[in-house]
């Protein structure tokens, strides 16, 4: 992982999977749980926040084969790799702090990206996600969290300059404030998948 003059960090798409699986042994279980949490929603349009190399999108599209996916990531290099896996997807350079792509979506998904925002940033993002979801749509958030038991912290993180995980309870509260009916669908140590349905 390298930082650029703007203070952003970028992963090497060639080595990202090896890095994340070495630091996060439950990575593939998290990915499977993320895809599972998207089931049960009639889905034609998907928005992914933090596409990375396309690992999550590929799994979600396997569940929703006829859906169209729009995705953002701040790394053009990661998106180049993702486009090879997802040639039909509309992938764009963009940050979580920026305006989300226009339109109404049935499903919004984010895996291992939102923990880079602080608490206020997460709460504000959840409000903007709710605005993009149709009634009956779902937001699936899979991420690094602060566990109740500190001994469950297994994923290496920095001093808060880039990694800013939050407690599950706080994220459920922010999601509820944004209008979601939110619940935890999977959890393992310092990882969790949360599904929020928009009434």
Please annotate each region the language model reported:
Residues 109:
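A conserved beta-strand element that flanks and buttresses the S-adenosyl-L-methionine
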Residues 1-40, 154:
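Conserved class I S-adenosyl-L-methionine
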Residues 43-44:
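Nucleotide donor/acceptor-binding cores
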Residues 47, 53-98:
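Class I SAM-dependent methyltransferase SAM/SAH-binding core
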Residues 112-116:
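Short catalytic micro-motifs in class I SAM-dependent methyltransferases
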Residues 194-199:
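C-terminal lobe and adjacent flexible extensions of AdoMet/dcAdoMet transferase-like proteins
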Residues 123-135:
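A short glycine-rich, Lys/Arg-flanked "PGG" loop and its adjoining helix->strand segment in the class I
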Residues 138-191:
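C-terminal alpha-helical "lid/dimerization" subdomain adjacent to the S-adenosyl-L-methionine
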């Amino acid at each position: 992982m390298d930082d650029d003059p703007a203070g952003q960090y970028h992963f090497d798409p060639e080595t990202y999977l090896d890095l994340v699986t070495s630091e996060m042994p439950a990575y593939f279980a998290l990915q499977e749980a993320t895809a599972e949490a998207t089931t049960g929603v009639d889905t034609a349009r998907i928005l992914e926040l933090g596409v990375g190399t396309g690992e999550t999108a590929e799994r979600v599209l396997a569940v929703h084969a006829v859906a169209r996916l729009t995705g953002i990531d701040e790394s053009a290099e990661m998106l180049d790799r993702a486009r090879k896996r997802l040639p039909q997807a509309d992938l764009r350079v963009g940050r979580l702090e920026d305006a989300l792509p226009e339109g109404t979506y049935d499903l919004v998904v984010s895996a291992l990206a939102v923990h880079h925002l602080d608490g206020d940033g997460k709460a504000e993002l959840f409000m903007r996600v709710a605005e993009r979801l149709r009634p009956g749509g779902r937001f699936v958030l899979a991420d690094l969290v602060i566990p109740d038991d500190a001994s469950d912290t297994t994923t290496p993180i920095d001093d808060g300059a880039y990694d800013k995980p939050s407690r599950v309870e706080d994220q459920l509260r922010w999601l509820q404030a944004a209008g979601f009916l939110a619940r935890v669908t999977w959890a393992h140590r310092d990882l969790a998948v949360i599904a929020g349905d928009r009434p």
